[in-house]
Amino acid sequence: YTSLDPVLQEEAEEACAEQNARMAGMGPDLESALVAMEPETGLVKAMVGGRDYYESQWNIATQGGQPTGSTFKVFTLVAAIEQGIDPDTKIDCTSPMDRPGAEPLENFGGADYGIQTIENATALSSNTGYYRLTEEVTPAAMNEMATRLGVGGEFVPNNTPTAVLGTENC
C-alpha cells in the first residue's frame, strides 16, 4: 500500500522539472525536491527527491539535511499572527539592509520592495522584510512555533534572525 496520489505525483514531478529548468546555469548542484503531505493524516501524497535517484542514490527530500531556505518564513508569520500582528501591517522590505557587524542583507536578485504589508512581503518572499519581522517577534518565538508545528528530529534552533533566511539545516 502507498499513500502516493498518481495525479499529484505527476504534477510534483512536472513542477520540479520546471524548477530545475529555471535553475539551469545558476550552479552545478542545484536541483529541486518536493514533499506534499495530507495535513489531517500526515500521509505523503507526492514526493520528488531530486532529478534521478537511480543515478545519485540520494533523496534530497528525505536524506538531505538541507538548509531550510524560505520555509521558516511561515513560522515567523504564524508566530506574528499569534502575537496579534495583522498581516496587513506594513513592514520595511527595502534592500540592501545594513546590519552592524555583518554583511548587508538583500532580497533575491537585489530587489528593493520598499514598504509592503506582511502579506505582500510573504508573497514576495522578502528576506529583508522577514528578517525585520523575525527581530520583532523574536527568533525564539519563530523556533518555538517551528517545533510546535512539527519540525523535529535533528533540528537545533539558531536563535538569530538569520534563521528565517534558511540558515538552519533540518
Please report, for each region that a protein language model flagged, where it lies by residue:
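Active-site SXXK
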Residues: 12, 41-42, 64-91, 121
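Conserved catalytic neighborhood of penicillin-recognizing serine enzymes
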Residues: 85-142, 159
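A short, well-structured edge-of-sheet supersecondary motif
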Residues: 28-54
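Active-site-proximal helix/loop microenvironment
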Residues: 152-170
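Short, charged, amphipathic alpha-helices and their helix-cap/turn boundaries
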Residues: 137-154
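A short, polar/charged loop-to-alpha-helix boundary motif
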Residues: 52-64
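Conserved, well-ordered alpha-helix/loop/beta-strand core segments that scaffold catalytic motifs
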Residues: 1-23
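Soluble non-cytosolic domains of exported or imported proteins
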Residues: 2-10, 65-71, 112-116, 124, ...
